């Protein structure tokens, strides 16, 4: 069983590393940024035994490593296609082809997965396990016969752990249309896709929740635009508007990249880490984001 379990896969993190394969990182605590530090992609966006559930009968954890193994299988399928997409953006191949559509579908699945596996989203869902048990009996999803079977197996005391594992399984892997994963996919899939390229000597940065969404009004359920940095060189926007025309990748100027980076950093309370290739640039973006927020309040 892996001790440090990532909520953002390493194959994504490494695309924001410098030429020496190291990330520059700033931690944000209580809204205040710390100092820049450097680390390998393995060293951030992870927690000890993040996807494990305490057991009363099977030792330390119930079915230890099960969720982490399933996530690793998902990542092993998505990672090559993610790298292929970045390669296509870099050299302009596959424009308008069925293969590109397939790669975008995989990208959407990956983005949806990042949302539901974030501990600040998944954690509260997992805590519902104990309170969910009476409801499951009421709906006869669980029965007295099930309890008797668990008792014979020596697992009766682990019913909360079993339900918590089921919650994670449904949230992270279910393709049922009612599942959180598929609800996010269904929002993104009809949207038009635009890719962006950063100019030389400029970079897209990422965060511990690398997603920025915008709504037309506070009463709307679904966003009208979603921004996601793909690497230090490329980013993507999903928008519920008319297509922008025949280009696959739109080159941006430095000011536009800065603006997108500020939107990402300031767009969510889930961002407790900001990372990229250049520590000084990260600090300047965080500072500019804070200044903009103060002006908005004033």
Region locations from a protein language model:
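Alpha-helical structural context detector biased toward long hydrophobic helices
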Residues: 1-4, 8-298
